[in-house]
Every structure is written in structure tokens, then in C-alpha cells.
From Swiss-Prot:
Residues 23-149 form the C2 domain. Keywords: Centromere, Chromosome, Coiled coil, Cytoplasmic vesicle, DNA damage, DNA repair, Endoplasmic reticulum, Endosome, Lysosome, Phosphoprotein. SUPFAM superfamilies: C2 domain (Calcium/lipid-binding domain, CaLB) (SSF49562). The lineage of its organism: Eukaryota, Metazoa, Chordata, Craniata, Vertebrata. It comes from Mus musculus. Residues 1-10 have a biased composition (Low complexity). Versatile protein that is involved in regulation of different cellular pathways implicated in membrane trafficking. Involved in regulation of the COPI-dependent retrograde transport from Golgi and the endoplasmic reticulum by associating with the NRZ complex; the function is dependent on its binding to phosphatidylinositol 3-phosphate (PtdIns(3)P). During autophagy acts as a regulatory subunit of the alternative PI3K complex II (PI3KC3-C2) that mediates formation of phosphatidylinositol 3-phosphate and is believed to be involved in maturation of autophagosomes and endocytosis. Involved in maintaining chromosomal stability. Promotes DNA double-strand break (DSB) repair by association with DNA-dependent protein kinase complex DNA-PK and activating it in non-homologous end joining (NHEJ). Required for centrosome stability and proper chromosome segregation. This is UV radiation resistance-associated protein. The gene is Uvrag. One of its GO terms (molecular function) is SH3 domain binding.
């Protein structure tokens, strides 16, 4: 078959051959019968293949694809299908046709169309074969592709593969119209008797139809004559049925009416009961409204009291936090070193072995400051602090890998336990970071203990941590000095040693109230510096203005034990202390009583009967003031154990004649510096902390 060939005209029948006859033992699917009435359409086409393509381009192999076109007697229309490209093949077999990508209005019932096969290389294709195909004129090739001719196109239909027909010599034209079939498939047609039976059956059916029509007409005529009487009977029966239905409905409605009337009476009785109950409840409601108005007034008063108390609590909390900045001042020197109460505390990674004593003291101050801040802010610390001064510890209750005995870590260097000490300092820094986070402050470096704490107090709590600013004073209520002067018992009775003292707890509600009341403090001593005026022969009783509060308290306790003098008047500033060497009641010049770290001057008369500079001048007419931080220090009396519950009964408030306005805290800070110095000396040499005996020359 050559290119650009066209086949048409009458389609001859194929000669007899193996494709037309069914051989014995062949499968049933191999049966193929050529019928003149068989029609092949475009919708029956499944795939197309080409064999033995002649290449005129000089290439050994070609890239090929085909296109399908509709046509008529005059022209060929635009392609309606294009196949994929088969590369490097002269015997391509393209995929099955996809009718889904063909135009929707494509007429698939046509049996004539044009096939064009294109070939080339690198997108340069040219027409190789063009064939106008009549599907009815194709020859059946079999269930498999067989091709011997050049440029042969094979069409795959539903029952097998078809190709171009070829002329067969040696067969007369008369045999071309013969149909070769199997004898087993041939049978006889109808005979005369069968046709007669069919004719008689048709006649009977016709006669039956005529009879049916006749009977139908008779029935219609009878119905037409009796239609009037039937209508009357129908209406009569309908009326009887309606009467029966209405009677039944009447009985049902009567019964329903009786039930509704009974229910109405029941509802009326219930309504009367509810009306009486409503009247009773209405009266109660009026009483409750009156009570509600009173409760609203009480609630308003309580709300105002709550707001006032809450505001006072907030102010008091800020005052206490401000007091902490006076008790534990954090300073920065020119070398960028931070000190708490005058004790240097480097960052956690800069600790040195030679500074173990000062580090323990500074960490004790810092731990107490952090624990008190958390107590005032009501923020529980994640790692609880056990305050023991310079032997404070901290617990880790979070880490589940630790046993109960291993949860407590020291905040002081302890021999070879350097790792536990470092971890304890780390937990302390974590507590500081927790407080900072509670107030919206970040902690980029945990190692800076005092810088983080100072920054937190100044920016988070709005409290200044240095010791150079002046505190505000608060008014102190007036009180008669005789009330305090008449207290039984002095401080000399039962004063325990500072290192063995334990805090006594209140056993009754009255004692608890007494413990909450701040006792008098060293306010008069802060007003004017205490001047020690020694007498002849009493060189051992010389007291410096900034002496240690601990030593002064011990001396004062020993002297009171010897003399049995009531110290209540000495604290209030109304009476002078009696000297053990002067039995006649002469005033001891220059004697200073120390209470909780502060010297309290007594009334001292000079030789000429005049008051000394250290004496106090009561002013009962004016309401005097003392600093908030000084008033708070009075609570330390009960905390340090220098007084008992009975002695605190007389210290319920600060007497007016001993409370004065204070503008600076130099003496208080001096006391703290002296105490810090002695604590540091204790860490270096325990013997230096002891007070020299009276018999010594010091």
C-alpha cells in the first residue's frame, strides 16, 4: 500500500479461508463471521497501529504520531484527534483512542474518515501516509497484528484487527458472494402447517377483540338507563353514613366537654391556692425589699471599707518594702562592686575562697531580703528559703531526682561542698528571677544577684535601695508617758543571750494583739547624737555614739541584773537609769540604753542640774512624728527576744514625748555598719566578736 492512497467503492466479500470457518478445537473467541449487513462505525475504533513505514528522510528511526479528520466528497476537515508521539520507531502502536478528549458534537456514527501519519525528528514532522478509510471495506486480520506490506495501517475494532483488503487470484467472482458457515448452525425455516396455525391464531384473536367491543357497548347502554336511580341510591347511602358519623362525633364531643369542665374546676381551685400563696409571697417580698435596701447600704459601707482597707494594705505593703531598702541597703561603689548592708557580694561566678565569711553574711542578708519581699508581696517562692543568718539554706522541692535529705542546699561555703553551695546560690538567683518575672521584668543574666535584686526593687517595686535619700515621716498618736512608765518589770528580767534567744509566741488573742503593736524605739537617739559623759571611776562604762547594739544590750542587761532597775522609764525617756555604784538615786551621766540595735538616751542631769544635750524634751501639746522605717524597727524587740509578752504590754504605742521628727538615718546606718563589721570579724576570728571583760585593759 503506497502513501496518499484512498480506498472506496463496493466492498467485496473475503474469500473462504481459515478466518471464515470454525476449525475443530479452536476457542470460541476465534469465531468471526463476515456478514454483508455488518456495519462498522467510528465509535467501534479502539486503536491504530502502523507497520513497515518507509523512511525517506535518511533517518533510521522516526518519531511518529497520527491525526484523524472528518471528510466529505470534496474536502478534508480539521483534525479532531491527535495521538501521542512514539519516538524512534518505524512500527508504532499508539495507545487506545480517548474519546473523552474529542469534541462533544463529534458524529461517531460515520464509517468514513481520513488518517494521516506524520514522522520526523526534533519537532520537524512531515506527512508520511494519508489514507481515506471506509471501515466497511476493511479486511479482518485476526486477533493479533499481522502485516507484510509497507506503510500498512492496522485498525483495532471490538472484534479484532482489520487492514486493507488485497486481491486474491484463482477465485471466481461467483464465489465472492458465498457465505461459508458451519453446518451445525443451519436450521429449517417455517413450513405450511406452521403458517396455518399462525393464521388461525390471528383469526381467533381478532374474533375475541370483536366480542369484547360488543359486550362493552351493551354494558355502557345499561349503565346509561339506570344512572338516575343509582345516583339517588348513592346519595341516600351517603347521607345515612354522614348521620352515623355525626352522632358518633356528638357523643365524643360531649365526653370531651365533660372532661374539660372537670379540668376547669380543678384549675380554678389551683389558681385560688396560687393566688393566696402569691399574696403571702408578695408580703414577704416587700419585707425582703426593705431588708435589701438596708443590706445594700451595709454592702456599700463594707465595699468602701474594703476599698479603703485594700488601699491601706497596698500602702502598708509599699511602706514595708521601703523599710526593707533601709534595713538592707544595696550600694554600688566606684569599682562597680555591689554591697548589701556594707558587705560585698560578687556575682555567683566570682566567689573567692578568701571571702567565704563575707559571702556567707551577704548571702544571708540577700536571702532574708528576698524572703521578706516574697512575704510582703504574698508571692510564694518556688524554692523556699530557710533564714538562719549567715547559715541560711534553700530547698529544692521541684527536682524529683533528689531525695528528701538532699533537697536542702547551703547558702554559705561549706568545706568541700562547693557544688551544693553553687547550686544553692543558683536557686536563690532563680527566686529573684521569679519575683522579677512576677512584675514583668526579664532576667537575662541569673549570675548578677545584687544587680538583679536592686534593679527589681527600683524598677519593679519603685523603691530606692541606696542609703542617701531622706525618708518620709508618719504621725504618731499622742499618749501619756505615765502609762508606759508604770509598766511592771524591766528588760533586765530574763534577758536571754542573743545567740540562744528564741522567739516567744503569743498564747492568747490579747498577747497576739500586743505582739502586733510596735513598741517604742530609738527615735530620741536618732534625733540628736548620743553624747557619752563618763564619770570619775567609771571608765568601763564609756559608750561610743555608734557602738554595737548587741554589746550595748548585753551591758545594759548586766547592769540591770546588778541594780534591779526598772528600764521602762529609760526606754520612754522620762526617768534616768540608776548606777550600781550610786545607791542614792543619782542620775548616771552619759548612760545609753540599747534596744534592738539602737542607743536610747535617758534623762540626764548635769552637775548644775541642767539637762544634757542627749536628753529629750517632751512636748505633750504638739503631735510629733517619727520615720516609718524607725517605727518598724521597734518590732525587732519581740523578734530578737529582748522582751517578753508582759513587757510588750506597756509598748503598745510610741509615747508622744519620745517620738520626734527625723530627717536622716545616719545613726541607724552606723549601727548596721558596726554590726556588719562584727559579723565579718566573726567569720575571720571568732574571738574578736566577744566583748572584752571588765577586768581587761581594753
Amino acid at each position: 500500500m503506497s502513501s496518499c492512497a484512498s480506498l472506496g467503492g463496493p466492498v467485496p466479500l473475503p474469500p473462504p479461508g481459515p478466518s471464515a470457518a470454525l476449525t475443530s478445537g479452536a476457542p470460541a473467541r476465534a469465531l468471526h463471521v463476515e456478514l454483508p449487513s455488518q456495519q462498522r462505525r467510528l465509535r467501534h475504533l479502539r486503536n491504530i497501529a502502523a507497520r513497515n513505514i518507509v523512511n525517506r528522510n535518511g533517518h533510521q528511526l522516526l518519531d511518529t504520531y497520527f491525526t484523524l479528520h472528518l471528510c466529505d466528497n470534496e474536502k478534508i476537515f480539521k483534525e479532531f484527534y491527535r495521538s501521542e508521539v512514539i519516538k524512534n520507531s518505524l512500527n508504532p502502536t499508539w495507545r487506545s483512542l480517548d474519546f473523552g478528549i474529542m469534541p462533544d458534537r463529534l458524529d461517531t456514527s460515520v464509517s468514513c474518515f481520513v488518517v494521516k501519519i506524520w514522522g520526523g525528528k526534533e519537532e520537524a514532522f512531515q506527512l508520511l501516509i494519508e489514507w481515506k478509510v471506509y471501515l466497511d471495506g476493511l479486511k479482518y486480520l485476526g486477533q493479533q497484528i499481522h502485516a507484510r506490506n509497507q506503510n500498512e495501517i492496522i485498525f483495532g475494532l471490538n472484534d479484532g484487527y482489520y487492514g486493507a483488503p488485497c486481491e486474491h487470484k484463482g477465485h471466481p467472482n461467483a464465489q465472492k458472494n458465498l457465505l461459508q458457515v458451519d453446518q451445525n448452525c443451519v436450521r429449517n425455516s417455517y413450513d405450511v402447517f406452521s403458517l396455518l396455525r399462525l393464521h388461525r391464531a390471528q383469526c381467533a384473536i381478532k374474533q375475541t377483540q370483536v366480542t369484547v367491543q360488543r359486550l362493552g357497548k351493551e354494558i355502557e347502554e345499561k349503565l346509561r338507563l339506570t344512572s338516575t336511580s343509582n345516583e339517588l341510591k348513592k346519595e341516600s347511602e351517603c347521607l345515612r353514613l354522614k348521620i352515623l358519623v355525626l352522632r358518633n362525633e356528638l357523643e365524643r364531643q360531649k365526653k370531651a366537654l365533660g372532661r374539660e369542665v372537670a379540668f376547669l374546676h380543678k384549675q380554678q381551685m389551683a389558681l385560688q391556692d396560687k393566688g393566696s400563696a402569691f399574696s403571702t409571697e408578695h408580703g414577704k417580698l416587700q419585707l425582703q425589699k426593705d431588708s435589701l435596701s438596708e443590706l445594700r447600704k451595709e454592702c456599700t459601707a463594707k465595699r468602701e471599707l474594703f476599698l479603703k482597707t485594700n488601699a491601706q494594705l497596698t500602702i502598708r505593703c509599699r511602706q514595708l518594702l521601703s523599710e526593707l531598702s533601709y534595713i538592707y541597703p544595696i550600694d554600688l561603689n566606684e569599682n562597680k562592686d555591689y554591697f548589701v548592708c556594707g558587705v560585698k557580694l560578687p556575682n555567683s561566678e566570682d566567689f573567692q575562697a578568701k571571702d567565704d565569711g563575707s559571702i556567707a553574711v551577704a548571702l544571708g542578708y540577700t536571702a532574708h531580703l528576698v524572703s521578706m519581699i516574697s512575704f510582703f508581696l504574698q508571692v510564694p517562692l518556688r524554692y523556699p528559703i530557710i533564714h538562719k543568718g549567715s547559715r541560711s539554706t534553700i530547698k529544692d522541692n521541684i527536682n524529683d531526682k533528689l531525695t528528701e535529705k538532699e533537697r536542702e542546699f547551703p547558702l554559705y561555703p561549706k568545706g568541700g561542698e562547693k557544688l551544693q553551695f553553687d547550686y544553692g546560690v543558683y536557686l536563690l538567683n532563680k527566686n529573684i528571677a521569679q519575683l522579677r518575672y512576677q512584675h514583668g521584668l526579664g532576667t537575662p543574666d541569673l549570675r548578677q544577684t545584687l544587680p538583679n535584686l536592686k534593679n527589681f526593687m527600683e524598677h519593679g517595686l519603685m523603691v530606692r535601695c541606696d542609703r542617701h535619700h531622706i525618708s518620709n515621716a508618719i504621725p504618731v498618736p499622742k499618749r501619756q508617758s505615765s502609762t508606759f512608765g508604770g509598766a511592771d518589770g524591766g528588760f533586765s528580767a530574763g534577758i536571754p543571750s542573743p545567740d540562744k534567744v528564741h522567739r516567744k509566741r503569743a498564747s492568747s488573742e490579747n498577747e497576739r494583739l500586743q505582739y502586733k503593736t510596735p513598741p517604742p524605739s530609738y527615735n530620741s537617739a536618732l534625733t540628736q547624737p548620743g553624747v557619752a559623759m563618763p564619770t570619775s571611776g567609771d571608765s568601763e562604762r564609756k559608750v561610743a555614739p555608734l557602738s554595737s547594739s548587741l554589746d550595748t544590750s548585753l551591758d545594759f542587761s548586766k547592769e540591770n541584773k546588778k541594780a534591779g532597775v526598772d528600764l521602762g522609764s529609760s526606754v520612754s525617756g522620762d526617768h534616768g537609769n540608776s548606777d550600781s555604784g550610786q545607791e542614792q538615786g543619782e542620775a548616771l551621766p552619759g548612760h545609753l540604753a540599747a534596744v534592738n540595735g539602737t542607743a536610747l538616751p535617758s534623762e540626764q542631769a548635769g552637775p548644775a542640774g541642767t539637762l544634757l544635750p542627749g536628753s529629750c524634751h517632751p512636748a505633750p501639746s504638739a503631735e510629733l512624728c517619727c520615720a516609718v522605717e524607725q517605727a518598724e524597727e521597734i518590732i525587732g524587740l519581740e523578734a530578737t527576744g529582748f522582751t517578753s509578752g508582759d513587757q510588750l504590754e506597756a509598748l503598745s504605742c510610741i509615747p508622744v514625748d519620745s517620738a520626734v521628727a527625723v530627717e536622716c538615718d545616719e545613726q541607724v546606718l552606723g549601727e548596721f555598719e558596726e554590726f556588719s563589721r562584727r559579723i565579718y570579724a566573726l567569720s575571720e576570728n571568732v574571738s574578736s566578736f566577744r566583748r572584752p571583760r571588765r577586768s581587761s585593759d581594753k
